[in-house]
């Protein structure tokens, strides 16, 4: 089999049709999977010795949340080192990173695997992976044909990274040095709420504004603060953390502003406070709503005038600090109740950000679960940790009052329990491994079965034919979208459609 010009042109056209990078990446992967008739395909971005999934087709949804460190995945490390097409033999002893992650075939091992490293010049920027369940599935394609595919994918990814970099630099004030955009490695999630939050982070990071980050406990406010700092011109300087809720009143002022020798009992030497440590960098004040009114007044002065006084010292020190504050309280209500200063609130909330709770993030829960599964796999030295369909269904319908932190702990506990119930280094998480309160799952939909005067095979084919027709009509005859709607493999759908007479 060889690629025609029409096939390559179709791939290029699909890339141009996409609206935004994510849509283009998904169109690329879906089209490639259809053309190559493989069981699974993925586009990965390379960053800091790990591969980060950008788009997948034919793989479990939680793969998008996983981070594949090279030291834990020898096949991916081989792809990163190769510099050219890598074909893994069916009997390769190197474990496939997607074993157990192809829906409907969790118990089967991937047989055929091809890796295509993607380069921008001499720099590795990503990889394409193609997987199939048949050992000789990709033998019909020459290395030269696969290199053409890799070149198209590398061009799309390289352009996306360049645009991302240029957009970031355009938001810089004046002649500030270029900086990196918000790293997708940290901010996991594709829900509308998280997409909007990432955009807002990218916007405010380029400025020097104070930011108030609000959100329920466990939503990841500290992660947002890190993302802002790392995407800002101050990223070369320290990000200093202080949990205001853990500060005893007797030492709070010293922690913030420092003290001089002899300022109080136990002050045996001069000591810098958090503001001095964060000079020219960023200070993250977590749980800002827990500060006393007296300390709030002193904090306000620093924000207004940019100088501090160590405890026991009459001299003022100039500091250049950007303040990021976080709270799980409604500070407007705290102001009305007299527990928080209105002037400080307005100083801090120049650019407010709200982190959505996990229950409002849709399928992000599955992506995050995949991320934590991969963390557990590496930490415990397991060959794989995968979620069963029942576990995924449970996670999607649980309310998670403790948000992402609760999910993380639940995954870690479930892995330990599942590992104890089976031998070997492979763990499959089932619903019973999660100790959630009773969760009401929606009843399965049962379709009405019409009375037909056909044998079983004819009735089955008639049902399949009509189902595919309806799905195609609803998806404007887009086969990839139709396959996603029917939750089946697009290559298998094409083969079935041909057998049913729906395609030539």
Curated annotation (Swiss-Prot):
Signal peptide: none annotated. CDD domains: AAA. Transmembrane segments: none annotated. It comes from Escherichia coli O127:H6 (strain E2348/69 / EPEC). Residues 187-416 form the Sigma-54 factor interaction domain. The lineage of its organism: Bacteria, Pseudomonadati, Pseudomonadota, Gammaproteobacteria, Enterobacterales. The keyword Ion transport does not apply. Keywords: ATP-binding, DNA-binding, Nucleotide-binding, Phosphoprotein, Transcription, Transcription regulation. The modification 4-aspartylphosphate is found at residue 57. This is Anaerobic nitric oxide reductase transcription regulator NorR. ATP binds at residues 215-222, 278-287.
């Amino acid at each position: 089999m060889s690629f025609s010009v029409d096939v390559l042109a179709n791939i290029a056209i699909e890339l141009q049709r996409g609206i935004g990078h994510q849509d283009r990446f998904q169109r690329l992967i879906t089209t490639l999977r259809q053309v190559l008739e493989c069981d699974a395909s993925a586009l990965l971005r390379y960053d800091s010795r790990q591969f980060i999934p950008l788009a997948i087709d034919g793989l479990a949804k939680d793969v998008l949340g996983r981070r594949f460190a090279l030291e834990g995945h020898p096949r991916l490390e081989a792809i990163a080192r190769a510099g050219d097409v890598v074909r893994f033999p069916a009997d390769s002893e190197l474990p496939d990173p997607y074993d157990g992650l192809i829906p409907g075939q969790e118990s089967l091992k991937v047989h055929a695997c091809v890796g295509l490293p993607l380069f921008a010049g001499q720099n590795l920027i990503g990889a394409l992976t193609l997987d199939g369940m048949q050992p000789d599935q990709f033998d019909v394609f020459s290395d030269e044909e696969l290199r053409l595919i890799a070149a198209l994918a590398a061009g799309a990814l390289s352009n996306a990274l360049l645009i991302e970099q240029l957009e970031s630099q355009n938001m810089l004030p004046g002649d500030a040095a270029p900086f990196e955009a918000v790293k997708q490695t940290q901010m996991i999630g594709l829900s509308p709420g998280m997409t909007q939050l990432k955009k807002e982070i990218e916007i405010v990071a380029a400025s020097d504004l104070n930011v108030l980050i609000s959100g329920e406990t466990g939503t990841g406010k500290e992660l947002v603060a890190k993302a802002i700092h790392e995407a800002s011109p101050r990223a070369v300087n320290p990000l200093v953390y202080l949990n205001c809720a853990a500060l005893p009143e007797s030492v709070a002022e010293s922690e913030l502003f420092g003290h001089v020798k002899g300022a109080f009992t136990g002050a045996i030497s001069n000591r810098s406070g958090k503001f001095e440590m964060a000079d020219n960098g960023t200070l993250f004040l977590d749980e800002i709503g827990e500060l006393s009114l007296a300390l709030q007044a002193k904090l306000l002065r620093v924000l207004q005038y940019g100088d501090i006084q160590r405890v026991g010292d009459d001299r003022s020190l100039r500091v250049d600090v950007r303040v990021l504050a976080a709270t799980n309280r409604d500070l407007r209500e705290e102001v009305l109740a007299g527990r928080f200063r209105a002037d400080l609130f307005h100083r801090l909330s120049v650019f407010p950000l709200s982190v959505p709770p996990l229950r409002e993030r849709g399928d992000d829960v599955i992506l995050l679960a995949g991320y934590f599964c991969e963390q557990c796999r590496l930490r415990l030295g397991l060959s794989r940790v995968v979620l069963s369909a029942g576990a995924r269904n449970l996670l999607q319908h649980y309310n998670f009052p403790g948000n992402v932190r609760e999910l993380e702990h639940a995954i870690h506990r479930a892995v330990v329990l599942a590992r104890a119930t089976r031998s070997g280094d492979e763990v499959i998480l089932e619903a019973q491994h999660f100790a959630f309160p009773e969760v009401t799952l929606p009843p399965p939909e049962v379709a009405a079965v019409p009375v037909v005067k056909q044998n079983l095979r004819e009735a089955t084919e008639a049902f399949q034919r009509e189902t595919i027709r309806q799905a195609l009509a609803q998806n404007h005859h887009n086969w990839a979208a139709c396959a996603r709607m029917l939750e089946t493999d697009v290559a298998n759908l094409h083969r079935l459609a041909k057998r049913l007479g729906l395609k030539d």
